[in-house]
Swiss-Prot record:
Alphabetized CDD domains for the sequence: GrpE
Similarity comment text for this entry: Belongs to the GrpE family.
Keyword annotations from UniProtKB, A to Z: Chaperone, Cytoplasm, Stress response
GO BP annotation list: protein folding
Annotated region described as Disordered, given as residue ranges: 1-43
Location within or outside the cell: Cytoplasm
Gene3D superfamilies assigned to the protein according to its UniProt record, in alphabetical order: 3.90.20.20, Head domain of nucleotide exchange factor GrpE
A Pfam family recorded for this sequence: GrpE
Protein source organism: Cronobacter sakazakii (strain ATCC BAA-894)
Name under which the protein is recorded: Protein GrpE
PANTHER family: GRPE PROTEIN (PTHR21237), GRPE PROTEIN HOMOLOG, MITOCHONDRIAL (PTHR21237:SF23)
GO molecular function, one term: protein homodimerization activity
Coiled coil stretches, renumbered: none
Subunit structure: Homodimer.
Amino acid sequence: MSSKEQKTPDGQAPEEIVTEQHEEVESVESAESAEQVDPRDEEIARLQSELTQAQNRERDTVLRMKAEMENLRRRTEQDIEKAHKFALEKFINELLPVIDSLDRALEVANKENQDMAAMVEGIELTLKSMLDVVRKFGVEVIADTNVPLDPNVHQAIAMVESEDVAPNHVLAVMQKGYTLNGRTIRAAMVTVAKAKA
């Protein structure tokens, strides 16, 4: 018998047996490798997950810090702006009694007396100059009558019945008020109209 004609006891050629055994070994190895995951792969996956979480935490921290720095910068700018805007408040408060005194001097001065005319004119010019200067720095006078009572700028000291002025409107200003850049530094003392009973 030649080698090609040799048969195994099962009746299969030796090449067929080797091929079948090789296929069985490969299928067993692939089944085992599918069941057994390399522990290094698990460690790599765990480390990648931890790295991703750490990156996300760091990104959040950086974003929070940027937002906090932006808020701090904005608050600082606002504080500086307010400091510049209202730096004159103390000075203006000290100047108000002087302006009030000039106003009162004009009210009581006898304007018909020719001997006093020059003095009255001097007081008027001084008061006008002083008011012009303080207006340049954001000071506004609150002295309007027949306007609605505004508790932000008016302090009502009396209520008087009136037919000429609408109820809850300023009837008379007893003492002028002042604002500095929109902030009330002294409320105007006013008499308020009320409806006749």
